[in-house]
Amino acid sequence: MILYPAIDLKDGECVRLKLGEMSEATVYNRDPAAQAKAFEEQGFEWLHVVDLNGAFAGASVNGAAVEAILKATRNPVQLGGGIRSLEQIEAWLERGLARVILGTVAVRDPALVREACGKFPGKIAVGIDARGGKVAVEGWAETSDLTAAELAKRFEGAGVAAIIYTDIDRDGVLTGINWEATIALADAVSIPIIASGGLASMADIERMVKPDAAKLEGAISGRALYDGRIDPKEALAMLRKARA
């Protein structure tokens, strides 16, 4: 079970949004590379990065900030937001990314996701972001008719390394992860699930290590870490103990 600290990039800065609204951005660090280094020094094993501008633009916008992060940390980094082609995937992996997250393109062009999984085994994750149970795309600006489980099942056997499941209605508001929906998704597919959206306190960390959450690969935390609601040392110790 891995706790992924999140760096969301908007205009080159480390921010957190509320319910996915770009107008509701709180700046936590104007130096994302320094934040990445701080997370590494706190003992985190991975880093979750999202190019928020890129998610809306359909192409990488905060590339310079991502490259600075890659230079600042030795931890593996997964990146999502605006990555929509094999060429973009390959370019980012060549720059040192450990994993690329495909969101909108997983809905629009699932064949590309399967091709990417074949070409870059173990390097492709699918981001499934749901609002009211339906998958949202284009930086959460549009909602499709697909449910999270329907989309996830399309990629069974494709070689997807993980599915990052975000409940948009919980994102950035510190109300706790939607464990019922997340565990239901984990039970519906064999692909490892990473929970995202709403992780609020140490109670969520304690929830992560319960037996019914055993299928989860981990969870992503943003605002709760930045606001000090989760103690990194205590959280990581709890997760390490659960893995032992």
From Swiss-Prot:
Localization per record: Cytoplasm
Reaction catalyzed: 1-(5-phospho-beta-D-ribosyl)-5-[(5-phospho-beta-D-ribosylamino)methylideneamino]imidazole-4-carboxamide = 5-[(5-phospho-1-deoxy-D-ribulos-1-ylimino)methylamino]-1-(5-phospho-beta-D-ribosyl)imidazole-4-carboxamide
Gene3D superfamilies named in the record: Aldolase class I
The protein's annotated pathway: Amino-acid biosynthesis; L-histidine biosynthesis; L-histidine from 5-phospho-alpha-D-ribose 1-diphosphate: step 4/9
Major place of residence: cytoplasm
A GO MF label: 1-(5-phosphoribosyl)-5-[(5-phosphoribosylamino)methylideneamino]imidazole-4-carboxamide isomerase activity
Pfam families hit by this protein: His_biosynth (PF00977)
CC terms in the record's Gene Ontology section: cytoplasm
Residues annotated as the enzyme's active site: 8 (proton acceptor), 129 (proton donor)
Keywords: Amino-acid biosynthesis, Cytoplasm, Histidine biosynthesis, Isomerase
Family as reported in the entry's similarity comment: Belongs to the HisA/HisF family.
Name of the protein in question: 1-(5-phosphoribosyl)-5-[(5-phosphoribosylamino)methylideneamino] imidazole-4-carboxamide isomerase
Species, as recorded: Chelativorans sp. (strain BNC1)
